[in-house]
Amino acid sequence: MMKLSLSALAVAAAVLTTGAQAQSTGYHVTRKTDQVDTYHGTPVADPYRWLEDDNSAETKAWVAAENEVTDQFLAAMPQRLPARRIYTELYNFERFGIPFREGGRYFWTRNDGLQQQNVLYTATSLKDGLKDRAAVALDPNLLSKDGTVALSGVVPSRDGKLLAYGIAGAGSDWQTWKVRDLATGQDLADKIDWVKFSSASWTADGKGFFYARYDAPKEGEALTGANYFQKLYYHRLGTAQGDDVLVAENRDDKEWGFGTEVSDDGKLLIISVWKSAGSKNGLMVLPLPKGAFAGGKPQPITLDFDAQYSPVAVVGGKLIVKTDKDAPRSRIASIDLKHPAAAGWKTLVAEGPDAMTGASAVGGRFLLSYLHDAATLVRVHGADGKRLSEVALPGIGTASGFGGRWDDKETFFSYTSLTNPAEIHRYDVKTGAISLFARPKTAFNPDEFETRREFVTSKDGTRLPIFIAAKKGLKLDGSNPTLLYGYGGFDISITPAYNVTAATWLKMGGVYVIASIRGGGEYGSAWHEAGTKLHKQNVFDDFIAAGEWLVVQKVASPTTLAINGGSNGGLLVGAVTNQRPDLFAAAVPQVGVMDMLRYQKFTIGWAWATDYGTSDDAAMFKALYAYSPLHNIKSGVKYPAVLITTGDHDDRVVPAHSFKYAATLQAADTGPAPKLIRIETNAGHGAGKPTSKIIEERSDILAFIANTMKLEVK
């Protein structure tokens, strides 16, 4: 339990008074102000605006006081300790990342089970699998005592001798990049600061790499200030960051950002230009010299930002891209770099009935990943685009990986389902042979459970898949404790994949369900766009329909059904809780976007406008105001139990979203069920979170839901 110091308590007493307790959890009353904003003639109160200042003593005292109330409640739950024990047992298994090869060396990550961060390993051969003859390339567990410093990216040089790597602290999106000599295990003097939303791309000679960064933020604004005007640089080893070569920027458009990759032959820099968190982007290329890079002017291929253009490879002077231009479910196109006008693009692989979600070029073949009703299929095509075969996956689930270069003979992939942890497989590109490389051994027995795919009809007649995992022999009597998860945004597909939260809930006697709803990419760009902007309500309708289906089919009932989602999924949970509080027993929005009128004012929030729109537009204001979780809490209506989670260092979705939502929810008359907020200290949006914090937070979530449903956990 968090202990408040005397000084913190003194400050808390000044800003938080213990008023009449509307609910049994003993909330403090959060100070209100008379802040009112007017949007297109509509006045909107924002009484907790002061909570947006995460650096103020008042906000820090509020955080401490809220955490104390929450932890007292959680500590008293009989389900807390057994849930944590089960979660720890199921989390404690050896896990492997997907291997990749560079310069005659293989690289992969491994975690013994309860290590705070995954460790990067390397070996020149994988004849003995992923354990023997491996050397530690980089162990981030040595970078901090509490495990809060994580690897944000690793990129070996072409010869496999050097490793560019990014580190991030306390869950922040800000990264610092360094370079390690893999022969000595020592870091070079090079240090790159203020990197965000970028990786590194080495030149073929290994003398330097490309990366993107922002200007240093103003003092006190690192976690909240808006991120604009990203710039693309080349860093030459042995030089100061201040001497890096500026490759690309756009002084006339503050939203431009850059992603890079160098072609397999080292002759071309391919630049993806993004303007938002959506999938639409532009493309530029820059020929690279044989000698030292000293700069150059990128040549545009397309800067219309009208579709997705994902580089796959450069083959025979042609740039191969995966694109949804004139193909909502995507196609593979070939661009002649000497004549790159769109009119001359050739289709190598036409759009099919399933959504193409990934493409790689390995061993002279194209490996194309598709989703068929939210489960992975992988098809193999020749250099001419002709379909050759299909990768024989183990079952209905999710496969990922398949990386490599055009002249590689092998590639690796992972396969997982709701009840099977990720296995690592090797795929021989020429023969199509698959060999198992690593299969985790866990305390979870998948043979005791089954997963089935069902289809739900939404409010407007749209058909959507859901996946239900449960113990074999499930009784359909409405009594099953059921946890429904969703996301529904940014073209991100929700597919069946193993996670310890689901496994723990199943082990506790529950049913776990994921819903593949609009806003995601399960059926292509049209499916995504049907859940954006003025159509965002479709996302909520889909999720509500999934919940109603579970009740009608007697999988669950309103007293045994809980919902959960994070980030955009936190918005989903918040909105649906407001719209159908009668349908759920518990709701857990994690790091959610709750203030839809001001989200664009913080860090990278402006980039979400492609999915949400902004309150600056009158029509969008009306739509946003109609569902914004913060602005639609209904006083006088009985709400389910709510546990809000966030991190005090979240610089993706700033914690003020959750702070203001929690304060508003606690102040409203929403019935006796608890309305709590759990604020993780020294943690961010989720990436890089240490194992101990993951176990504590997620087991608390499951214990909270179980407690609400009076589920006994042994």
Residue ranges and their predicted role:
Residues 57-155, 166, 256-314, 347, ...:
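Non-catalytic accessory segments flanking enzyme active sites
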Residues 230, 234-274:
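Polar, glycine-rich mid-to-C-terminal structural blocks
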Residues 138-157, 165-172, 183-190, 427-433, ...:
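Cap/lid segment of the alpha/beta-hydrolase catalytic domain
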Residues 1-21:
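Gram-negative bacterial Sec-dependent N-terminal signal peptides
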